[in-house]
UniProtKB/Swiss-Prot annotation:
Its EC number is 2.7.7.6. This is DNA-directed RNA polymerase subunit beta. Belongs to the RNA polymerase beta chain family. The keyword Transcription applies. PANTHER family: DNA-DIRECTED RNA POLYMERASE I SUBUNIT 2 (PTHR20856). GO terms for biological process: DNA-templated transcription. It comes from Porphyromonas gingivalis (strain ATCC 33277 / DSM 20709 / CIP 103683 / JCM 12257 / NCTC 11834 / 2561). It comes from the Bacteria. Keywords: DNA-directed RNA polymerase, Nucleotidyltransferase, Transcription, Transferase. DNA-dependent RNA polymerase catalyzes the transcription of DNA into RNA using the four ribonucleoside triphosphates as substrates. Disulfide bonds: none annotated. The lineage of its organism: Bacteria, Pseudomonadati, Bacteroidota, Bacteroidia, Bacteroidales. It is an enzyme of class 2 (transferase). The gene is rpoB. It catalyses: RNA(n) + a ribonucleoside 5'-triphosphate = RNA(n+1) + diphosphate.
Length: 1269
């Protein structure tokens, strides 16, 4: 096989034209884009997302239907702060949401009420960044998609304790009551509404319009109607009645109190059902006024429907009215007031648009399951649905149909960001609509406007609580680009409306055959969430209905269709009953299968079939895995458990100072970096005009039309982040890889850094590895490292910590940031500026002051010494205490940045603020004027000599008449905020340009407005800070961490270990040419772990290093043994990678050859510096008086129960007594012991430990009284 070269890598894939990967962030970006539909004009917006929320809640009317508030359109203004500002100031990156609302009056009495159209502010909404995240309170967050049960109908089966199979059908709506139909052990079918009261299914049928037994039996075609005559009935003697013979008569009753006569309908049963016709019965029937009777058919299929007859027997009702009353009583536990209210209950439950909604998905699933043809727009239940479900259940009972598999992906769908936001906005707008209605009712006679009615806080409070507290709104894992992209593509079965960890069984967590190409079978967390949190596969997309789809090529008559039409995305349901061939099945040049038998998949089987039987073919063997799993070369040679660890650990790799892309990759590394949006990418073709370490400037190519309609400069400036802190305290530090004068193309990556090199993912380093023990130091997966790794910064990373100190207003006065701190030496404050903030560049050691702050002390009587100090130094000296922020015991680093945010000083005179604000107004008004002049120039040029087709505003008032010439004067008079951008002229091209110019003008105008608002706020209010906080200081400290003993490292195959020893270069084992190896791994870690991929990688990468080439070996379609042998032979290396090594200490050759190669190793985020902790004295728990636990609390170790047992076993009673009392929580005893030690006195008798007091109080709380003697 001849390998192909792409992107500087030699690719071993057998498929030469695989499908291009879809955008990896499409899940997030498309969903949010579809939710807002900002690029779509209002009249063309689909009824989905935000538009649908407005459509569902508007128009709003008051209770008398006098006033109507109608929704016309919504739009958003530019954000107040940039993403960078939000991150550094701890703010939310949001945009103001505004709606154009129209208020009018329908009541002729209110003639003076004019129709009002206003833009109403509905609150700020968090806005997604270009990389699919949200910035909430200064931290990047991700909304994880949720995998939940699809709305629709589900048929299930359970086993009763006596062995009877019970069947059920459950209808799950998008919103509204659940209804379940189930059989019981007596072969009777019941309906359960909201899992509460049960009623026979025939009662429900009567209540929805199938009143008589005849109507019910006719649904299933079960009864034969016989006209009542003596001759007819005589013929039928011996046959059983299928329905009751009833006699209906009117009974007049007089009310005892009022004497009023009330007519009551009475029903008497003449002959019950299931009774044989006899001479006596015939007489009774003839005497009643019945016209026809129903008899059992003689057909054979009636036995299948015995459940209906059994249910009719249990049914207490005989008419629709009785059934409605029965349902009402069951649900409400009360008697209905009248027939209408009884009917209303059942109508509201399932047949009302307001209360019940199956959603697009629910209707689609029910139609598909029951082969119905009901209009997709009907989102409520219909009688037809209920009848078909009952029929299907009867088929189930008779073993003529099968139950649903709840874990099948056709029964589970994905709630993406857009849908979750739609639900939240739905809640917020519904609340807002209520308050609007209340305000309308209150302000009946006043003149009011939409702004008076709407309360903007309602929506933003719901949305903010969703982003801040919802389980699916998660703090983004930002350790490296892979961690980011994986987090955004994650699917969780947990969260509101999903499963809970405790209730989820094995089946839900297990891999299902429908996961193929949709959900990754490998990447999932270890631990309690296993199988509940999964990742999307590389080619998977989410359909409009929320089902996960995967692409296949169509195969017709044994020939694969490689055209664009032949490629289709299939949901799990569409893939059912299809035979799918593997992606790397051998084909000839015409796309026909070479072999007579083809390996294929058919649902959960793997048959060998003839080419003609194949329906579809995988697009690529990579399609089965997620991004992280697809990054592991030779994945096919690894055990699944280790592959799982490998894909999870790559997400924990810290970005290195000098990263290197792997010699052996899988070909997906470049695509990942591009789609992660972490690097700066050229938007289109252009030329680099300026480059330095902090910014890149590019002049983009523009067409004449683009140049004309744009108000932007052609040169775009990109600023590069330098040592920016991530959520996980790793760093993003980008540097340019383009030069001045370079031509760039659209999509070209212009920078590297943050775990990338040359536009490819670079999580670690390629190191020379030997699989051999080294003096026992690599026992139990430990790793022996060459000192060169430390010296040459192979695994050095930079970590940035942020330290914050807030200045508050306290009851005793204002706190203050200062370097003048009481009782602190000058030496300790030498690096602080006048605000008490440490200078940039200062080296920090444990205990150093980072931010100096003083706080007013409590007013208690001063001691004589304090009185003297106050007399000498004035009032200031004694009334403040040191409240500075000091470096923690393990903090060592360099200050790289400091920030100080302050609210505007109150002392500023009002006049100076007014002056500044009016100057700002002038400056920005001038900018708006210039922008408007440029707009008029452009429009005048466009419309020169053109006849106008009419220019209208939102109220359809004609501002420029049709047929007139467009003059500059006319154009200057237009307000572009209220005009409709419909066709102004007869020329389509001109109209397009006019629209583009106007849209660009409005965008710039709004940006200028937002900037002005922002500047005014800065002048009047200062920085936005939470309530009660006057100032906030931030210090950023960078720590350079070299690899050291105790750090965790791993390869890509789940081969993890802890560095146990760093050995001098000359002591490491070396190759025959004198090259010392970089790392020694224990060979015993390979056989039991069954991750042989690492050996393949090591051998191939060694050849790659020797030949100075890089390889791509895609998973399940990578390098074969022959390919590897070819490259090892070219490089002059042993085919099996085994070679003799020499002892660094003695120079002797080792007895056996060892496997040597080059492996890609990562340094993980579990570093010993973060874990190392020791305490002598520190904080105690208030209640038990014992030391706190954990590094974060600076806690200590406790002498626990098992340690006490050890001392007891040795009989060390005095030591034990000391440990449990004076050395622990005997508060009085320990201070006395301290005194005794200081004075040299004998130790006092121990007292009562505090923990015993706690126990005594607990017992007293239980009502037990006792005393200690």
């Amino acid at each position: 096989m001849t390998p192909t070269t792409n992107n500087k890598r030699i690719n071993f894939a057998s498929i030469k034209n695989p499908l291009f990967y879809p955008d990896f962030l499409e899940v997030q970006l498309k969903s949010f884009h579809d939710f807002l539909q900002l690029d779509t004009p209002p009249e063309r917006r689909k009824k989905e997302g935000l538009y649908k929320v407005f459509a569902e809640n508007f128009p709003i009317t008051d209770t008398r239907n006098n006033f109507v508030l109608e929704f016309l359109d919504y739009y958003i203004d530019p954000p107040k702060y940039s993403i960078e500002e939000c991150l550094s100031r701890g703010l939310t990156y949001s945009v103001p949401l505004k709606a154009k609302l129209k208020l009018y009056c329908t009541d002729p009495d209110h003639e003076d009420f004019a129709t009002v159209i206003q833009d109403v502010f509905l609150g700020p909404i968090p806005y997604m960044t270009s990389s699919g995240t949200f910035v909430i309170n200064g931290a990047e967050r991700v909304i994880v998609s949720q995998l939940h049960r699809s709305p629709g109908v589900f048929f299930g089966q359970s086993l009763h304790t006596n062995g009877t199979k019970l069947y059920s059908a459950r209808i799950i709506p998008f919103k509204g009551s659940w209804i379940e139909f189930a059989t019981d052990i007596n072969n009777v079918m019941y309906a359960y509404i909201d899992r509460k009261k049960k009623l026979p299914v025939t009662t429900l049928l009567r209540a929805i319009g199938f009143e008589a037994d005849k109507d019910i039996l006719d649904i299933f075609n079960l009864a034969e109607e016989v006209k009542v005559t003596k001759a007819n009935l005589k013929k039928c003697i011996g046959r059983k009645l299928a329905a009751r013979v009833i006699n209906t008569y009117i009974d007049d009753l007089s009310d005892e109190d009022t004497g009023e006569v009330v007519s009551m309908e009475r029903i008497t049963v003449v002959v019950d059902r299931e009774v044989e016709l006899t001479e006596d019965n015939i007489e009774a029937i003839l005497n009643s006024n019945t016209q026809t009777i129903l008899l059992h058919r003689n057909d054979s299929n009636t036995s299948d429907y015995s459940i209906i007859f059994n249910t009719l027997q249990k049914d207490p009702c005989n008419s629709e009215k009785e059934a409605l009353y029965y349902v009402y009583r069951q649900l409400r536990n009360a008697e209905p007031a009248d027939d209408a209210s009884a009917r209303e209950v059942i109508t509201n439950l399932f047949f009302s648009d307001k209360r019940y909604d199956l959603g697009d998905v629910g209707r689609y699933r029910i139609n598909k399951k029951l082969n119905l043809n009901i209009d997709p727009d009907i989102k409520v239940l219909t009688n037809e649905d209920i009848i078909e479900i009952i029929k299907y259940l009867i088929e189930l009972v008779n073993s003529k149909a099968s139950v649903d598999d709840i874990d099948h992906l056709s029964n589970r769908r994905v709630r993406t960001v857009g849908e979750q936001l739609y639900n939240q906005f739905g809640i917020g707008l519904a609340r807002m609509a209520r308050t609007v209605r209340d305000r309308m009712n209150v302000r009946d006679n006043e003149v009011f406007t939409p702004i008076d009615l709407v309360n903007a806080k309602t929506i933003s409070s719901v949305v903010n609580s969703f982003f801040g507290t919802n389980a699916l709104s998660q703090f983004m894992d930002q350790t490296n680009p892979l961690a980011e992209i994986t987090h955004k593509r994650r699917l969780s079965a947990l969260g509101p409306g999903g499963l809970s960890r405790e209730r989820a069984g094995f089946e839900v967590r297990d891999v299902h055959y429908t996961h193929y190409g949709r959900l990754c079978p490998i990447e999932t967390p270890e631990g309690p969430n296993i199988g509940l949190i999964s990742s999307l596969c590389v080619y998977a997309k989410i359909s409009d209905l929320g089902f996960i789809t995967t692409p296949y090529r169509e195969v017709k008559n044994g020939k694969v269709d490689f055209s664009d039409n032949g490629l289709k995305y299939y949901t799990a349901e569409e893939e059912e009953e299809k035979t799918v061939a593997q992606g790397n099945a051998p084909l000839d040049e015409n796309g026909r299968f070479v072999r007579e038998r083809v390996k294929a998949r058919y649902e959960s089987d793997f048959p060998l079939v003839t080419p003609d039987e194949v329906d579809l073919m995988d697009v690529s063997p990579t399609q089965i895995a997620s991004i992280a799993a697809a990054l592991i070369p030779f994945l096919e040679h690894d055990d699944a458990n280790r592959a799982l660890m490998g894909s999870n650990m790559m997400r924990q790799a810290v970005p290195l100072l000098r990263p290197e892309s792997p010699i052996v990759g899988t070909g997906i590394e470049g695509k990942l970096v591009k789609d992660s949006r972490t690097q700066i990418v050229a938007e289109r073709g252009g030329e680099v005009v300026f480059v330095d370490a902090s910014c890149i400037k590019i002049r983009y190519d523009r067409t004449a039309d683009e140049e004309f309609v744009s108000f932007d400069d052609a040169i775009v400036t990109y600023y590069l982040p330098k040592y920016r802190k991530t959520n996980q305290s790793t760093t993003i530090d980008l540097h340019p890889i383009c030069s001045k004068g370079d031509r760039v193309e659209a999509g070209q990556i212009l920078t590297e850094g943050y775990s990338t090199q040359g536009g490819e993912l670079a999580l670690g380093r390629n190191v020379q590895v030997a699989y051999m023990p080294w003096k026992g130091y690599n026992y139990e997966d430990a790793i022996v490292l060459n000192e060169r790794m430390v010296r040459e910064d192979f695994f050095t990373s930079v970590h940035v910590d942020e330290y914050i100190l807030e200045v508050r207003e306290t009851k005793r006065g204002l706190e203050e940031l200062t370097s003048d701190i009481p009782n602190v030496s000058e030496d300790a404050t030498r690096d602080l500026d006048e605000n008490g903030i440490v200078r940039i560049g200062a080296h920090i050691e444990p205990g150093d002051i980072l931010i100096g702050k003083i706080t007013p002390k409590g007013e208690s009587d001063p001691t004589p010494e304090e009185k003297l100090l106050r007399a000498i130094f004035g009032d200031k000296a004694g009334d403040v205490k040191d409240a500075s922020l000091k470096a923690t015991p393990s903090l060592r680093g360099v200050v790289i940045d400091t920030k100080l945010f302050s609210k505007a000083a109150k002392k500023k005179s009002r006049t100076s603020t007014k002056e500044t604000v009016s100057k700002l107004d002038e400056t920005y008004a001038k900018r708006q004027q210039q922008l408007h002049e440029r707009l008029i120039e452009k429009l005048t040029e466009l419309t020169k000599g053109k006849t106008c087709c009419g220019v209208k505003d939102y109220l359809n008032v004609e501002l420029i008449k049709a047929g007139s010439k467009l003059t500059k004067k006319d154009l200057e008079a237009l307000d572009f905020n209220v005009i409709q951008l419909s066709d102004w002229t007869n020329d389509a091209h001109t109209n397009e340009l006019i629209k583009a110019v106007a849209v660009n003008y409005l965008k710039h105008s709004k940006e200028i407005e937002a900037e002005l608002r922002r500047r005014k706020l800065d002048e009047t209010i200062g920085d936005e800070l939470p309530a009660g906080i006057v100032q906030m200081a931030k210090v950023y400290i960078a720590k350079k961490r070299k690899i050291q003993v105790g750090d965790k490292m791993a390869g890509r195959h789940g081969n993890k270990g802890i560095v146990s020893k760093i050995v001098r270069q000359e002591d490491m084992p070396f190759l025959a040419d004198g090259t010392p190896v970089d790392i020694c791994l224990n060979p015993l870690g390979v056989p039991s772990r069954m991750n042989l991929g690492q050996i393949f990688e090591a051998v191939l990468a060694w050849a790659g290093r020797k030949m100075n080439v890089k390889f791509a070996t895609p998973i399940f379609d990578g390098a074969s043994l022959n390919d590897m042998n070819e490259w090892t032979d070219k490089a002059g290396l042993p085919r099996d990678g085994k070679t003799y090594l020499y002892d660094g200490g003695t120079g002797e050759r080792f007895d056996q050859p060892a496997t040597v190669g080059v492996t890609y190793f990562l340094k993980l985020g579990h570093m010993v510096d973060d874990k190392m902790h020791a305490r002598s004295i520190g904080p105690y728990s208030l209640i038990t008086q014992q030391p706190l636990g954990g590094k974060a609390q600076f806690g200590g170790q406790r002498f626990g129960e098992m340690e006490v047992w050890a001392l007891e076993a040795f009989g060390a009673s005095h030591i034990l007594q000391e440990i449990l009392t004076v050395k622990s929580d005997d508060v009085v005893g320990r201070s006395k012991a301290y005194e005794a030690i200081v004075k040299g006195d004998p130790m006092p008798t121990p007292g009562i430990p505090e923990s015993l007091n706690v126990l005594l109080h607990e017992l007293k709380g239980l009502g037990l009284s006792f005393s200690l003697d």
